[in-house]
Amino acid sequence: MLIQTDYVGWLNETITLLKQKNFDQVDWENLIEEIESLGRSQKRELRNRLTTMLEHCLKLCYTDYVEDYRGWQETIRRSQRELEELLRDSPSLKPYWDQVFLDCYATALKSLRDNPDYQSFNLPDDCPFPQEISQILQKKVWR
């Protein structure tokens, strides 16, 4: 199968077949699989970016590594912009945000607690940051 030897070639061929409405020649099984994986990829990207942002918010608010604050602030702002863009491009991810927000916080918290550099800090079990998308992406949540 072309998809196994030349992915871009397979994509181009599939696009051509669809545009020509030559549906009986389309590799439907692989096309469906690829479309499903796109959705999973978008969800994974949201989880990863949100977890990174929450981890850096925790570092900024609950540690005293002042020399790292600026870098963490930059990472938070970049994560906010990237999450805004992702949600603007895929608004149907907004309900997913609510489903994974606390899990992302738990992942960020575990990551820090497992790191010896942060074990001496009192990190909160409950998320101190707003879960509402418009609040956490539009303001300096570390204040």
Positions of the model-derived regions?
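Surface/interface-facing alpha-helical segments and adjacent flexible terminal/loop regions used
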Residues: M1-T51, L58-R143
